[in-house]
UniProtKB/Swiss-Prot annotation:
Entry protein name: Translation initiation factor IF-2
Gene it is expressed from: infB
Region (G5): 704-706
Species this chain originates from: Frankia casuarinae (strain DSM 45818 / CECT 9043 / HFP020203 / CcI3)
Binding site for GTP: 564-571, 614-618, 668-671
Listed Pro residues bias regions: 76-121, 154-178, 294-305
Coiled coil: none
Residue ranges occupied by any tr-type G domain in the UniProt entry: 555-727
Predominant localisation class: cytoplasm
Family: Belongs to the TRAFAC class translation factor GTPase superfamily. Classic translation factor GTPase family. IF-2 subfamily.
Higher taxonomy: Bacteria, Bacillati, Actinomycetota, Actinomycetes, Frankiales
Length: 1062
């Protein structure tokens, strides 16, 4: 068989069933799933080589051959000519049977011929006859002959080849009494065995030694190649094909002389004989269908009392003849047989089908049984064919006729439970119900890992191990760290922490840490700096770090950051240094951007470059001041001489001290009235800045930015401080690295970033990545708008070519190629997105579901922020999120960006009911028309604190009004009047305030409120209706349906007034 072959095809070719092939493949180390699986050509060759080496393999469920006693008879051979009827035999004579001749091998006919039409079978009833003892061999077993069966269609005799004597072998092909052999009609191409003489018995025409044989001949094997087991051939059914018989078996009531035995070797062969092949072993033991006397083990005397019930000796046949239906097998109990206990079939081996069986085991015909079919002849639990007597209770046997090998149903028979055998095995059991799995099925299921799913997977517990997780990590990330199932962690979080989280959702840091404590792990959240460091290390990159010994360092200019309180003159001082007017270009006269400039100052006759960074002094620009302090070498702290130290002054000083940079104090506005520079020196002494004239090491310089006084002294102090305390050197021949100070979206140039190079040289054409933005440097501009080809350390330039606007404060570095820059930026975007989702979602817990439902009713103000530079947008967002007007109103910024207001922003605002805040930007294109059409409100601001003030007022206006109770007046009841169709009316005297109609009232009796939430429905002054009655006047007050009014009660009226929110 070339190429791949299926298991059932190999089983058919080898003449075994599929289970045997599967077992053999497993023994050879090859795992095959089922009978329809394919195997490779090398495995097929190895399998074929293994079968001849092992001999005839034994399939599960078949009976094995056993050695028989010596001196047994021979097996009769099958006939070679079909179509001739056998001669009638004598009537059954009970007696001690001798050894039975074993049937010989089948001789196939040269060509199949159709059988003659069947003749009506007439049942022959055998009369009981006194048994005559017959001397048997010492190894024979006592047994009684079976009752005669009805004669079947006669078949021609055929000479058979005698076989050598061998031990007895139980024949699984014994015919059933009372049923026709061969299924009532000879099958085409099936030879019919003759009724020749048997060894050890009388010749033709005389009585047989073991009693009469069965009524008809057994069909022989089909000529040609041997057929596969029925369980492996999907195109054959047991009821249509020939029975895989090893040869005809003489049975009781057989007409004609017994067949001639065939000599066989006495050595037993392991395994089950295949159909159509000679069977090893000696003669079959006597009993029903025996051709000779049954051997008696140990020379035991015959059983007294004549034949036992069920032995077949002289017993009438079963009712029903040959064609009657067989009743349910479950209604019969095991019948005792003529053999010793545990040996069904008389002298057969235990568990083998044959003549009489032991109690509780399938055995021979145990007396009259209704039904025209014999019982199943096989070991319990094994599919046997027709043949040997009644089957076990509850298991109907196969049809009448020659019995097949154990495990294969006979021709014309049926599988278990009376159902036709399937393509890959015998049919089901006789009784309904669920079948039990065999050991092999359980073993294969266990080996294949087909286990039932278990509820509640185990989670490995820790012993305090540290686990590093990034911000916004999911439970799947946690499971990867501890080698657990993410679904199990979801279950743990839900059952033990009460939070509903999926395996892939981003979790908050608190949730991850609490889960770690629950499972015995120490969860460490990786900081953004460490995350970025690990990301760059994955690309063999690094930011910052120490210089190597082989790196050549060059001197660089100092980076000076000007810091201080708002309106203390920082930008004006820079204008004086640069001889420019930056303040005039700032809205509101305050700095709202961080700017970087490089100027050349003459110090001691030398022109020294100095890089200045201007930071805003407004309180909302804390992040800008912090970034300025991080990238600077020297901080110039500007303090107004007339104003002194202010909150932002202290904050700027703290930033400088945290960065560990030296500070130079510039006392500005010394020319202004009321200026007191000494006071400033004294105040800063409290914060650790001691002037040199006071014995400290901090240089104080008195300057006037307006009059440009003592500017050279300030520059000299900066240079001296840099030379004295700083080593201003950096490498120039390495990849450029630095910090993005500011970013904006230019209408004609696209994203523009102001970067400060810290090391290396930045050139046009380099691939750079800054935060989540990446690109290639298309052009570089200086502070005056001139082109720059390359920028060295401490040089601020504007870089064009980014794909998006970098955030202020992002680190930038040059990478080898654009692909690496894009991958780094994408990973940073994913990391930030996960962190934002973890913070924004806020996992719902079982305890906070109702609270969140209530929060859904809370009023919320949605905003979209657009600004000119990223630093201003960041400062505005931080300032707005700090506004707190109460829990009833929330502020949510759904989008922010740099650049003009676009139509996309308008559509997003329309869908989310948001307000657009434009900071130093205007609408683009038709955004204004679209906003008017969609009803979207757009606010424009150029000063940041104006935007903050308006948003705060809007939030306060969205608050729900708060009401308080205001007392209007009280009236004392003097008399109670009964008015028809109205009720009781209180004649009262107004003691204080005013009593008005339709106001709320309460009734007080003896200082206790009797009724509350009443309404003054009627108010009269004498007979006239009145709207209000003032103090000192009498009136009649009706409280509607409330009539429990008594004299001396007090009626108090009040109203709810709205209280303005603070």
């Amino acid at each position: 068989m070339a190429g791949k072959a299926r298991v059932h095809e190999l089983a058919k070719e080898l003449g075994v069933d599929s289970k045997t092939v599967l077992a053999k493949l497993k023994d050879l180390g090859e795992f095959v799933k089922s009978a329809s699986s394919t195997v490779e050509a090398p495995v097929v060759r190895k399998l074929k080589e293994a079968f001849p080496a092992d001999g005839a393999p034994t399939s599960p469920g078949r009976a094995t051959s056993r050695p028989g006693p010596p001196g047994g008879g021979a097996r009769p051979t099958p006939p070679s000519r079909p179509g001739l009827a056998p001669r009638p035999g004598p009537r059954p004579v009970p007696g001690r049977p001798g050894p039975l001749g074993r049937p010989g091998p089948a001789t196939p006919a040269p060509s199949p011929s159709p059988a003659s039409p069947p003749l009506p079978a007439s049942p022959v009833q055998a009369s009981p006859v006194q048994a005559s003892p017959v001397q048997a061999s010492p190894t024979s077993a006592p047994a009684a002959p079976r009752p005669a069966a009805a004669s079947a269609v006669p078949a021609p005799p055929m000479p058979s080849v005698p076989s050598a004597p061998s031990g007895p072998r139980p024949g699984p092909n014994a015919p059933r009494p009372g049923a026709p052999q061969g299924g009532g009609r000879p099958r085409p191409g099936t030879p019919v065995p003759p009724s020749g003489p048997t060894a050890g018995g009388p010749t033709a025409g005389g009585p047989t030694a073991g009693g009469p044989t069965a009524g008809g001949p057994r069909p022989g094997p089909r000529p040609g190649p041997r057929s596969a087991a029925p369980g492996n051939n999907p195109y054959t059914t047991p009821s249509a094909g020939p029975r895989p018989s090893a040869g005809p078996r003489p049975s009781a009531g057989q007409s004609g002389p017994p067949s001639t035995p065939t000599p066989r070797p006495s050595a037993p062969r392991s395994g089950t004989p295949r159909p159509g092949t000679p069977r090893p072993g000696g003669p079959r033991p006597g009993g029903t269908g025996a051709g000779g006397p049954r051997p008696t083990p140990g020379g035991m005397p015959p059983r007294p009392g004549g034949p036992r019930s069920g032995a077949g000796g002289g017993m009438p046949p079963r009712p029903g003849g040959t064609g009657g239906p067989r009743p349910n097998a479950n209604m019969f109990q095991p019948r005792p047989a003529g053999g010793p206990p545990g040996r069904p079939g008389g002298g057969g081996a235990p568990g083998r089908p044959g003549g009489g069986g032991a109690p509780g085991r399938p055995g021979g015909g145990g007396g009259p049984r209704p039904g025209g079919f014999a019982g199943r002849g096989g070991a319990p639990g094994r599919p046997g064919g027709g043949g040997g007597g009644g089957g076990a209770p509850g298991r109907p046997g196969g049809g009448g006729g020659g019995g097949g090998a154990p495990g294969r149903p006979a021709a014309g028979g049926r599988g278990r439970g009376g159902t036709t055998a399937g393509a890959f095995g015998p049919g089901g059991r006789g009784r309904p119900g669920r079948q039990r799995k065999s050991k092999r099925a359980k073993r294969q299921e266990w080996e294949s890992g087909l286990e039932a799913p278990r509820m509640g997977a185990m989670v490995p517990r820790g012993n305090g191990q540290a686990i590093r997780l990034p911000r916004g990590a999911s439970l799947a990330d946690f499971a990867d760290k501890i080698d657990a199932n993410p679904g199990a962690l979801v279950q743990v979080v839900f059952t033990q922490l009460g939070e509903m989280v999926t395996a892939t959702q981003s979790c908050t840091d608190e949730t991850l840490q609490l889960l770690g404590v629950t499972l015995g792990y120490e969860v460490q959240i990786v900081s953004p700096e460490d995350e970025d460091k690990e990301l760059l290390e994955s690309f063999d990159l690094s930011f910052g770090g120490e210089y190597g010994d082989d790196v050549e360092l060059s001197s660089r200019p100092p980076v000076v950051t000007v810091m201080g309180h708002v309106d203390h003159g920082k930008t004006k001082l820079l204008d004086a240094i640069r001889s420019t007017d930056v303040v005039g270009g700032e809205a509101g006269g305050i700095t709202q951007h961080i700017g970087a400039y490089q100027v050349r100052a003459k110090v001691d006759g030398d022109e020294r470059p100095i890089t200045f960074i201007d930071t805003p002094g407004h309180e909302t620009f804390t992040a800008m001041r912090a970034r300025g302090a991080q990238v600077t070498d020297i901080v110039v702290l500007v303090v107004a001489a007339d104003d002194g130290v202010k909150p932002q002054t202290i904050e700027a000083l703290n930033h400088a001290q945290a960065a560990g940079v030296p500070v130079v104090v510039a006392v500005n506005k010394v020319d202004k009235e009321g200026a007191d520079p000494a006071k400033v020196r004294g105040q800063l002494t409290e914060y650790g800045l001691v002037a040199e004239e006071y014995g400290g090491d901090t240089m104080f310089v008195d300057v006037s930015a307006r009059n440009r006084t003592n500017i050279d002294g300030l520059l000299e102090a900066i240079v001296l401080t840099a030379d004295a305390s700083l080593d201003l050197r950096a490498p120039t021949e390495v990849e450029a690295q630095g910090v993005a100070i500011e970013g904006r979206l230019d209408r004609g140039r696209g994203p523009v970033a102001t970067v400060l190079v810290q090391r290396g040289t930045l050139r046009v054409g380099d691939s750079v990545v800054a935060g989540e933005a990446f690109g290639r440097v298309r052009a570089m501009l200086d502070e005056h708008g001139g082109q720059v080809v390359e920028a060295g350390p401490a040089r601020p330039v504007q870089v064009l070519g980014f794909t998006s606007v970098p955030d202020a404060g992002d680190n930038f570095l040059v990478v080898p190629e654009d692909r690496v820059a894009r991958q780094i930026a994408e990973r940073r975007q994913a990391r930030e997105r996960n962190a934002e989702l973890a913070l924004s979602r806020g996992r719902p817990t079982l305890e906070t579901i109702l609270e969140r439902m209530k929060e859904g009713e809370k009023t919320q103000l949605n905003l979209i922020l657009k600004g000119d530079v990223s630093g201003s947008v960041e400062a505005l967002e931080d300032a707005l999120l700090k506004i707190d007007v109460g829990d009833e109103v929330g502020l949510r910024i759904i989008d922010r960006g740099v650049g003009a207001i676009t139509e996309t922003n308008v559509m997003l605002a329309s869908a989310s009911d948001a307000i657009i805040i434009g900071f130093n930007v205007r609408p683009q294109g038709k955004a204004t028309e679209l906003a008017d059409r969609e009803g979207v409100e757009v606010r424009y601001y150029s000063v940041i604190y104006q935007a903050i003030e308006d948003i705060e007022n809007a939030l306060k206006g969205m608050l729900k009004p708060v009401y308080e109770e205001a007392q209007l007046g009280t009236a004392e009841v003097r008399e109670v009047f009964r008015v028809p169709r109205i009720g009781n009316v209180a004649g009262s005297l107004v003691r204080s305030g005013v009593i008005r109609r339709n106001t709320k009232a309460r009734l007080i009796r003896d200082g206790v409120v009797v009724a509350d939430n009443l309404t003054v429905e009627s108010l009269k002054r004498f007979k006239d209706d009145a709207t209000e009655v003032r103090e000192g006047y009498e009136c009649g007050i009706g409280l509607g349906s409330f009539n429990d009014i008594k004299i001396d009660d007090v009626i108090e009226t009040f109203e709810q007034r709205e209280v303005p929110r603070a």
